[in-house]
């Protein structure tokens, strides 16, 4: 039985579980007053890819509050799967906005889950490296972060090589799977399953947070991966069969109709519904042309992921996981 829960808006105090007071207060100030050429604004990462728009603080607090509400539902045992598609703002740092992310709701959600669950696994399937989440937990062995992403020179955020493995007590608890352009469903699933199988056995998580950005999908303006919602769905199914409390978040996705297709397909999968292939008539129906169907066809781009290189990455990850205490 699925249900919709009205989310709360996160208070400044709740957001300060991760973010600094100074950053939150500055975001609140510029959100209300606009940017008065305050020199601190750029230091806080505001501008460029995180422009100051009126009401952005309230919007961030709403996204953060929804993720916290979802985490609370899991903690209280009211559900086993909770979803917040507007969430997944995985780039924000504790005192800095980054990559369209003004707040790191994923980190807030993980911290909330840790009030009950000792070991939390974070899996990031966005096109971009989940750097903000990895950084937040790079020194702890209580949160393992796994990120599958595009890694190539000049591609944002430029981090997440296979050699980035965490620090101090968190050494070997950060897992990065750097991929190249053109990857399709079958190979992606093979890699994802191969890594997660080892992770599950080694880390034995008590709860999972999944970030499912849709910028990996064919047709995205990023023109990088060549996935379909079915491929992401297969990875999601693999995680859900663990039967653990699972918090599901959105993320990137810059072809809006395809992002809607993807998250609709995944929502149906989560609640066990089969959807008609035809897009129903609604206000934005014309956006779904020329074929007006739920399915997305991969493009004819080559897969740049060399099989031998992929095997080397997987062997390296397996070797690192053997060192997890």
UniProtKB/Swiss-Prot annotation:
The active site is at residue 91. It is an enzyme of class 3 (hydrolase). GO terms for molecular function: histone deacetylase activity; histone deacetylase activity, hydrolytic mechanism; histone decrotonylase activity; metal ion binding. InterPro entries: HDAC_PDAC, His_deacetylse, His_deacetylse_1, His_deacetylse_dom, His_deacetylse_dom_sf, Ureohydrolase_dom_sf. This is Histone deacetylase 8. It is found in: Nucleus; Chromosome; Cytoplasm. The keyword Nucleotide-binding does not apply. Substrate binds at residues 49, 99, 254. Residues 1-272 are annotated as: Histone deacetylase. Its main location: nucleus. Keywords: Chromatin regulator, Chromosome, Cytoplasm, Hydrolase, Metal-binding, Nucleus, Repressor, Transcription, Transcription regulation. Gene3D superfamilies: Histone deacetylase domain (3.40.800.20). One of its GO terms (cellular component) is cytoplasm. Its EC number is 3.5.1.98, 3.5.1.-. Binds 1 divalent metal cation per subunit. It catalyses: N(6)-acetyl-L-lysyl-[histone] + H2O = L-lysyl-[histone] + acetate; N(6)-acetyl-L-lysyl-[protein] + H2O = L-lysyl-[protein] + acetate; N(6)-(2E)-butenoyl-L-lysyl-[protein] + H2O = (2E)-2-butenoate + L-lysyl-[protein]. The keyword Cytoplasm applies. Histone deacetylase that catalyzes the deacetylation of lysine residues on the N-terminal part of the core histones (H2A, H2B, H3 and H4). Histone deacetylation gives a tag for epigenetic repression and plays an important role in transcriptional regulation, cell cycle progression and developmental events. Histone deacetylases act via the formation of large multiprotein complexes. Also involved in the deacetylation of non-histone proteins. Its activity is inhibited by trichostatin A (TSA) and butyrate, 2 well known histone deacetylase inhibitors. Belongs to the histone deacetylase family. HD type 1 subfamily. Pfam families: Hist_deacetyl (PF00850). Its cofactor is a divalent metal cation. GO terms for biological process: heterochromatin formation. Signal peptide: none annotated. A divalent metal cation binds at residues 126, 128, 215.
